[in-house]
Amino acid sequence: MRKKKFRNILVVLGGASGERAVSLESGRACVRALKKKGYKVKTFDPKFKNFNLINRLKIDVIFNALHGKDGEDGVAQSYFENLNIPYTHSGVISSHNAMNKIISKEIFNKNKILTPSYFSLQKKDFGINIVKKLIKRKKINFPVVIKPVNEGSSLGVKIVKNLKDLIKNTKVQFK
C-alpha cells in the first residue's frame, strides 16, 4: 500500500487558552518552515472559528500547534478524530492523561517512575486545616511548588516558602 502524501496542511494555532501567544508564535514558525519545504499551508484559529469549519477546507493533515487547555488535553484531538482527518499530536486519551498532572502522577507511580511527593487540593474542600493535615500526612516540607492541574507550560507555577504563602497563592489559583 502506498503512503498518502500530505501536501495540503492545516496549522491549527492560537486558541483561547492562557497559552494563546505561545501557540501563535510556534504555529507561525511551523507555517514558515512548512512553506519553505514546499507544502501548501492554511491556518485555522479556533478562538474565532468553529472546528467544524475545518471540514470545508481541502486539507490532507492537521498540524496541531495549539498549546494548553483545549489544545493539548484531548479536546482538539477529539474534534480532529471526529472529522476523520489525520493530525500531529498524541491521541485523545494520551493527551488528556498527559495534560492532567494528577493522572500523570498516578501513571508514573503505577509504573514505578519516581516523582516528587505531591498532594492535590480541590476548591470544594480547600481550607487551612485541610492543607496543614495534608502537609503533615504527606511529610512535605517547604518550599513547595504549586501548579494548576490542567495548565501547560509554566502558567500558574509558584514556589512558596511557607504555609501562609501556600494558602494565599492557592486561593489565587482557585479564582
Cite the ranges covered by each PLM segment.
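Acidic/histidine-enriched active-site and ligand-binding environments that engage anionic O-linkages
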Residues: 132-146
